[in-house]
Each structure stands twice: as structure tokens, then as C-alpha cells.
Amino acid sequence: MSEQDFREIARNGLWRNNPGLVQLLGLCPLLGTSNSTVNALGLGLATMLVLACSNAAVSLVRGAVSEAIRLPAFVMIIAVLTTCIELLMQAWTYELYQVLGIFIPLITTNCVILGRAEAFAAKNGVLRASFDGLLMGLGFALVLLVLGGLRELLGQGTLLADMHLLFGPAAADWKIQPFPQYQGFLLAILPPGAFIMLGLLIALKNRIDESLAERAKVQAGDVPATQRQRQRVRVTGVIE
């Protein structure tokens, strides 16, 4: 696997084909658990682990599974890995597991995981499949984390609250309150706020993509006629 392959997979997972901002997959957990940073980070890490491990497992067994039972077999693999993550969370982060509730078992049915297993892991080697799962999971987790941080900041005026649920008592003092007198904005932590914030993030990404595309065209010498005309007016003072 070449360095170019690694870069291409990384760009797709983190930005160009991001599961949350481009593919719009996994919206149920993305919107349902992103009301705080700790919830978003906990579910994001769990999803990333399941996605990376399931891609590796699917790639390993892809030659031994027939076409007729491929999807049920993939779902079984994902379900086993999700159960393992669920048991680990019950053992080490039980309070966070209780907060996340049904969203942990629902990782099994997350379209991001099954989609990558079918579209990529079943057609590539273990290394490529594992890296794709890791980067797709990381891209999904980052969107969850940004969304959770923004909603927590706007809704409650805090950041990193209750991080001890994930990292233990040592993280109890990680809470940040930038505006002590801020009373909070209830809409931000309600479901409508999740839709609004996700829409704004998608719009921001699209705008950045447009700016990058325009800059690439300019650097390549493909400047639009109207822009060339404006540049000529600034130089000559004559409108043609």
C-alpha cells in the first residue's frame, strides 16, 4: 500500500467523503447523542473502534463468505464487535454507558459501518480496509465531537463537562466555563438545535470546498472572464 493510497483514504474519510457531512449516514446517533462533548466523544470512539475492527474482520473473511449470505455475515461480525465494545463500556465507563443507552447497541445497524464493509472492506486487503475503517470512524467521531462541543457551549455555556464519565476522576476538573454568567440556550441541546447545527456545519464545509475549488482554478490559470475583466479594469482603468 503506497503513501498515495494512505493519503487518498485519509482525505476521503476525514473530509471529501466524510460520513457525517457528505454521506449523511448515521444521523440517528449523530443527532441524538451530540448534546454534550462527553456523550459525543464516547459514542464517536466506540463507533470508530467497531468500524476499524469490522473492516479488518470483513476483509479477512471476504474470500470465505458466499455472495448469498454476505450481508447477514457482515451484520453478525459487526454485532459481535459492538457487543464487545458494549461489555467493555459496562466494565470501565458504566455511567457513560447508561447515559448513551440504546445508542451503543444501535452501532450494529449504523449505515456507516455496514456501508464501508460492503463497499470497501469486502474488496480490499486487511491493511487498506483497516485504515479506511479507522479514518472513516475518525471522521465521524470528529463531526460528533465538534457538534457536541458547539451544542454544549451554546446550550449550557460549558465545555468538557462530566468528562470523568469517560476518563475517570482525574478528568473531573476539565470542565471549562468561558462565560460564567451565561444562562444557556435551550434550543441548542434539543433535537431541533441538532438539525440546525449540523446544517450549519454542512454549509460551512460546502463553502470551504467552493473556495478551495476556486483557488485551484485560479492557480491553474482558469480564471473566469468576469474576474479577468475586473483585474484588467484595475490595471488599465478601461472597461472593455
Swiss-Prot record:
A GO term from the CC aspect: plasma membrane
Disulfide bond residue pairs: none
Presence of the UniProt keyword Plastid in the record: no
Enzyme class, first EC level, given as a word: translocase
Segments passing through the bilayer: 41-61, 71-91, 95-115, 130-150, 184-204
Highest taxon above the source species: Bacteria
Keywords per UniProt: Cell inner membrane, Cell membrane, Electron transport, Membrane, Translocase, Transmembrane, Transmembrane helix, Transport
Subcellular localization, as worded in the UniProt entry: Cell inner membrane
Its EC number(s): 7.-.-.-
GO biological process annotation, one example: electron transport chain
Keyword Translocase: yes
Membrane topology: Multi-pass membrane protein
InterPro entries assigned to the protein according to its UniProt record, in alphabetical order: NqrDE/RnfAE (IPR003667), RnfE (IPR010968)
PANTHER family for the chain: ELECTRON TRANSPORT COMPLEX PROTEIN RNFE, ION-TRANSLOCATING OXIDOREDUCTASE COMPLEX SUBUNIT E
Subunit structure: The complex is composed of six subunits: RnfA, RnfB, RnfC, RnfD, RnfE and RnfG.
Role, per record: Part of a membrane-bound complex that couples electron transfer with translocation of ions across the membrane.
Family to which this protein belongs: Belongs to the NqrDE/RnfAE family.
Protein name according to UniProt: Ion-translocating oxidoreductase complex subunit E
Organism: Pseudomonas aeruginosa (strain ATCC 15692 / DSM 22644 / CIP 104116 / JCM 14847 / LMG 12228 / 1C / PRS 101 / PAO1)
Species lineage: Bacteria, Pseudomonadati, Pseudomonadota, Gammaproteobacteria, Pseudomonadales
